[in-house]
């Protein structure tokens, strides 16, 4: 806002929780490589997990059925210390119990995807950001995309985040958890998300069978569905399976809605706190000309 720079399709926004679909794909790539199995214990790769979390599986992290508490609840609101993915096991170690027995319930938690970034690093032998670049962004031509690390990487055409304070928009671009990558640390552009969406439809990165599993609601131990797959909320619409996700972090609010049977994908990226891009995406999808 300070420079009145215009947003373009190449402008990079922080994805917040839209990042989770990329983290999930990284895990699936490693499963296809034979470096891990989706039903492995997470502790195989993250041995520093607290004792109460040592029976949690990678699948349960992917589907928010682990019962693990959200690490953000252990971060003091006025903290200026930057939390990283590697700090998450210690943060959840401040507690001593799961919210529910793993696999028996659903509870959306950023903890799972921060831990999955550690799983990716240790299974691949590469930093999480480098793995994303080499296995996802570069092969798909996503030249504006990066899992941003301050002092390590840069964001090519970066939109900074803003919040409305006392009637004025002020820059509120980073919080104490902004350095956590697995749950929300990717910056990308609309141009790059077109490449991503085409790759999903064409099964360029993972097999059709694995993609189908990612787009299927997880099932709890009592047979109930959760409405969440691997990095996507999943529900039914008149046109078939509907995939969606909302992302919100300091200064950014985003939404994605995808209906594969209609070959329809709607993405809204905003560099502001608040607003309701998910509602707008749903209203766009309902337009008569797009049905």
Task: Give the location of each predicted region.
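Structural recognition of the beta-strand scaffold that forms the well-ordered cores
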Residues: 14, 60-62, 107, 114, ...
């Amino acid at each position: 806002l300070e420079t009145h720079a215009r947003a373009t399709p190449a402008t990079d926004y922080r994805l917040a929780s839209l990042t989770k679909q990329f983290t999930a794909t990284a895990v699936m790539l490693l499963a296809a490589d034979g470096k891990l199995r989706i039903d492995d214990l997470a502790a195989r790769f993250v041995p520093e997990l607290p004792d109460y979390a040592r029976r949690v599986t990678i699948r349960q992290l992917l589907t928010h059925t682990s019962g693990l508490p959200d690490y953000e609840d252990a971060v003091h609101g006025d903290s200026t210390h930057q939390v990283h993915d590697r700090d998450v096991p210690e943060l959840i170690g401040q507690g001593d119990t799961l919210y529910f027995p793993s696999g028996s319930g659903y509870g959306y938690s950023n903890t799972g995807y921060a831990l999955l970034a550690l799983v990716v690093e240790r299974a691949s032998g590469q930093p999480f950001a480098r793995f994303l670049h080499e296995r996802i962004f570069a092969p798909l031509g996503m030249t504006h995309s990066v899992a941003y690390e301050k002092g390590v990487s840069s964001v090519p055409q970066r939109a900074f985040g803003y919040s409305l304070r006392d009637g004025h928009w002020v820059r509120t671009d980073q919080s104490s958890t902004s350095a956590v990558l697995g749950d929300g640390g990717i910056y990308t552009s609309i141009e790059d998300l077109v490449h991503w969406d085409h790759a999903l439809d064409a099964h360029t990165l993972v097999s059709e069978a694995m993609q189908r599993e990612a787009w299927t609601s997880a099932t709890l131990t009592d047979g109930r569905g959760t409405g969440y797959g691997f990095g996507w909320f999943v529900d039914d619409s008149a046109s078939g399976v509907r995939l969606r996700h909302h992302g919100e972090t300091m200064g950014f609010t985003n939404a994605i809605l995808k209906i594969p049977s209609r070959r329809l994908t709607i993405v809204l990226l905003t560099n502001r706190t608040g607003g309701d891009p998910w509602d707008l995406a749903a209203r766009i999808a309902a337009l008569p000309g797009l049905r």
